[in-house]
Amino acid sequence: MSEDQHKCQYIDPENHLCPNEATDDGLCFWHSLNVDKSGSDIKDKLEHYAQHGGFLRGLKLQHCELDDIDLVNHGHKTGYDLSYCDFYRASLRDAHLFNANLNNASLMKTDLRDANLNCTSLLNANLLGIKLSGCKIENIDFGKNIFQEELAKLAIEKKHYSSAHDYYVQSEEIYRDLRKHSESEGLFNYAGAFIKKELTMRRMQQPKYSAKRIVSKGIDLFCGYGEEPMRIVGFSILLIFICAILYSVTGLNYHGDFYIFDINASFKDNINWFFSCLYYSIVTFTTLGYGDFTPIGVSRAIAAFEAFTGSFTIALFVVVFVKKMTR
């Protein structure tokens, strides 16, 4: 038998090879699913293995009792690389995983209560059913999208809409759990981002052109589900400028005289007229109504729409801003 055949045959999706000796099934103790790892000494074995430079990627640790395990790479800037590890239903209560790399790991239904996950990387990790009560999650890198969300997008590309719906339901559940835990830990910046993603996942479960999905998308664009007050400011500025342009071409009455954009007038006169319309648009949006300009004809409909939208937008901005600042 060649030397390579004595080696563990595990190779991860990034082509990292395990250098350990293989057991009867061609895999080492840590990568084999046929080896019993349910003993109480598994925690000490894993700590010793990690501290002595063991290959930690892709370990099969389903159902293992790893409470209070110390997997902090002391004295090094980078933590242990636990990429692609499978912790399905493992118990990691009070575990120390500071700065660990858990990218692409499966933490499905893992018990991480009171564990320390500060500064860990969880890119593309499966977090479905994870237990986080008391877990420290500051400065975690969750990535732009979670694992199930990426699967949902891939399913849509392949036109597997039923599977995509299931993945979006799972994504909503995960974001809800992360949001609730962030709120309980006082991490309100995280909570704000997670509520936005949670509601986005809920929207994606609706039929593509349904009224609920369209309204939800509009709310997202308008104020980021209440988490983006500056979007309201941007919308307000855009609306004021659009209405100002419309006023300039539909005309306004000023002290009994009717004014409108004139292509034959000088550039200076038209610019002055536009700024007058901009002033009127601001006054109308804020519902001040000084009375120096009055709308005529089509301008009345534009002014009515802008005044209604302005009063609603200002009130919404106050609510969203106060909510954001008082967290």
Q: Which ranges hold each PLM region?
A:
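Coil-to-alpha-helix initiation sites in intrinsically disordered, low-complexity, charged segments
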Residues: 145, 150-152, 203-217, 269-276, ...
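Extended, hydrophilic extramembrane loops/domains of integral membrane proteins
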Residues: 188-206
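Short amphipathic alpha-helical coupling elements at transmembrane boundaries
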Residues: 193-196, 220, 303
